[in-house]
């Protein structure tokens, strides 16, 4: 386990490589020579430079792309915050293994490997309206599981999650980190009715009140109000930064899971791109707070890494244009 204390983890969050300015500038310079008006490929151009910065090479590659789906169960579901029972988490992990979920199809189309990592599904986190979701030991174990999952031979990673009830901790973390109260951040998740939405708001308000003493520390927020799969995504996002691997973030839960890193370090999420904006109401607000403009807006709210996986082919397109387009000189095309 790479992190044996919160102090060790905090130190790792403050020691973040900045990426390669040289590689990013080389990509930008090449983009300006290609057979197109400068800047006309929009974000495809900046995506190519982003890849170069974090891979540390002026000709990035996407030979190995992997989607990680972390799964966990939540004690706060006892408050009636989800339309589905917690056993669906285990059932969906089996569905992933059988190839029957949306993420299986999207990963295949994207040319990405899929790694599903269940986290102690038989032991839900604590109900954060009553106790911290995780004590220090459980939190560090989950963070370490995510950190250890990411390996240096990967070129791009996507993070997703599965966990019945996990939009509730996502909203709670967002409220704790950025303020505004529970109602501002709370949506319908898997489709709760008005009464269920009210229960979510009440549960989040109770959690924020009970754990008020922990809310000044982003790591305290993640432990008290989060979940194992969220902590693992946090750890995986940190590992990717240390290893120089760019990250596509999925929806609301995934973004909330990574958000404490941005509160610990001003450039904590610079190696990430928000793949899409979810239909879950808090996600757009969270992306705005983090300064992460999404690539896609398709009205999705599935999770599983589905939106992140869809964005892989946009990143592939950016790289293909950068690598294979001719320059004006090579093509014999006159410049203005």
From Swiss-Prot:
The EC number(s) this enzyme carries: 2.4.2.21
InterPro entries membership: Nict_dMeBzImd_PRibTrfase, Nict_dMeBzImd_PRibTrfase_bact, Nict_dMeBzImd_PRibTrfase_N, Nict_dMeBzImd_PRibTrfase_sf
Active site: 304
UniProt keyword Glycosyltransferase, yes or no: yes
Protein encoded by which gene: cobT
UniProt cross-references to NCBIfam families, sorted A to Z: cobT_DBIPRT, PRK00105.1
Pathway noted in the entry: Nucleoside biosynthesis; alpha-ribazole biosynthesis; alpha-ribazole from 5,6-dimethylbenzimidazole: step 1/2
Functional note: Catalyzes the synthesis of alpha-ribazole-5'-phosphate from nicotinate mononucleotide (NAMN) and 5,6-dimethylbenzimidazole (DMB).
Protein name in UniProt: Nicotinate-nucleotide--dimethylbenzimidazole phosphoribosyltransferase
GO biological process: cobalamin biosynthetic process
PANTHER family: NICOTINATE-NUCLEOTIDE--DIMETHYLBENZIMIDAZOLE PHOSPHORIBOSYLTRANSFERASE (PTHR43463:SF1)
Source superkingdom: Bacteria
Keyword set, alphabetical order: Cobalamin biosynthesis, Glycosyltransferase, Transferase
Group of enzyme by EC: transferase
GO molecular function, one term: nicotinate-nucleotide-dimethylbenzimidazole phosphoribosyltransferase activity
Reaction catalysed by this enzyme: 5,6-dimethylbenzimidazole + nicotinate beta-D-ribonucleotide = alpha-ribazole 5'-phosphate + nicotinate + H(+)
UniProt keyword Glycosyltransferase present: yes
Source species: Mesorhizobium japonicum (strain LMG 29417 / CECT 9101 / MAFF 303099)
Family: Belongs to the CobT family.
């Amino acid at each position: 386990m790479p992190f044996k204390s919160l102090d060790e983890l905090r130190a790792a969050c403050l020691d973040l490589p900045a990426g390669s300015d040289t590689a990013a500038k080389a990509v930008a310079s090449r983009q300006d020579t290609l057979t197109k008006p400068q800047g006309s490929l929009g974000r495809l151009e900046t995506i190519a430079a982003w890849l170069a910065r974090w891979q540390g090479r002026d000709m990035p590659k996407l030979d190995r792309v992997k989607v990680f789906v972390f799964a966990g169960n939540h004690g706060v579901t006892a408050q009636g915050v989800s339309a589905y029972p917690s056993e669906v988490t285990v059932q969906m992990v089996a569905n992933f293994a059988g190839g029957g979920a949306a993420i299986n199809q999207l990963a295949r189309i994207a040319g990405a490997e899929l790694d599903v990592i269940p986290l102690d599904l038989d032991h839900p986190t604590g109900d954060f309206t009553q106790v911290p979701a995780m004590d220090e030991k459980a939190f560090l174990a989950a963070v370490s599981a995510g950190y250890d999952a990411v390996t240096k031979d990967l070129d791009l990673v996507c993070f997703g999650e599965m966990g019945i009830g996990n939009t509730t901790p996502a909203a709670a973390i967002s409220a704790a980190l950025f303020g505004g109260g529970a109602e501002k951040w709370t949506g319908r998740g898997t489709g709760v009715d008005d009464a269920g939405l009210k229960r979510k708001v009440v549960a989040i308000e109770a959690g924020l009140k009970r754990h008020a003493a922990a809310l000044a520390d982003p790591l305290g927020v993640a432990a008290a109000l989060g979940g194992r799969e969220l902590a693992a995504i946090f750890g995986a996002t940190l590992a990717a930064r240390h290893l120089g691997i760019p990250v596509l973030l999925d929806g609301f839960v995934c973004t909330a899971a990574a958000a404490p890193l941005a509160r610990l370090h001003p450039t904590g999420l610079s190696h990430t791109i928000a793949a899409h904006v979810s239909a879950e109401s808090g996600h757009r607000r969270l992306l705005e707070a983090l300064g992460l403009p999404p690539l896609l807006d398709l009205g999705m709210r599935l999770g599983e890494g589905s939106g992140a996986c869809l964005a892989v082919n946009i990143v592939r397109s950016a790289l293909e244009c950068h690598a294979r387009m001719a320059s004006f000189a090579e093509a014999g095309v006159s410049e203005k």
